[in-house]
């Protein structure tokens, strides 16, 4: 009887842990920082395929430059959040995001359930 209770309890704990785990492919905030917030440039593209050169410094600042004639240059600040990161572009309010793997060397930047940008290296 005790063995059944122990096994049932262990199964319940494992199931609960599986439900609380982040979805496969989602980057933890520290992994976002290690991959992207290093001061090295990477490419971001919008769902409409407007591309930018992005640079996030380890100190919490960021810049973007359009890679074509569309889009605008800007600067701002970033900080890690509980499940991703938040950014504030000059003249705009803060927005928070999660980052999810989306292929080889490609990541989706997500608000709620929608990708608002794709990052590549």
Regions found by a protein language model. Give the residues of each.
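Positively charged n-region of N-terminal signal peptides that target proteins for export
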Residues: 1-4
């Amino acid at each position: 009887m005790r063995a059944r209770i122990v096994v049932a309890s262990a199964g319940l704990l494992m199931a609960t842990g599986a439900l609380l785990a982040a979805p496969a492919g989602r980057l933890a905030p520290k992994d976002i920082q290690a991959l992207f917030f290093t001061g090295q440039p990477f490419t971001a593209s919008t769902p409409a395929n407007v591309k930018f050169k992005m640079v996030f410094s380890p100190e919490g600042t960021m810049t973007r430059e359009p890679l074509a004639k569309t889009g605008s240059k800007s600067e701002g600040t970033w900080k890690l959040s509980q499940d991703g990161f938040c950014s504030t572009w000059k003249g705009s309010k803060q927005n928070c995001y999660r980052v999810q793997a989306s292929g080889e060397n490609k990541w989706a930047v997500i608000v709620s359930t929608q990708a608002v940008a794709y990052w590549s290296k």
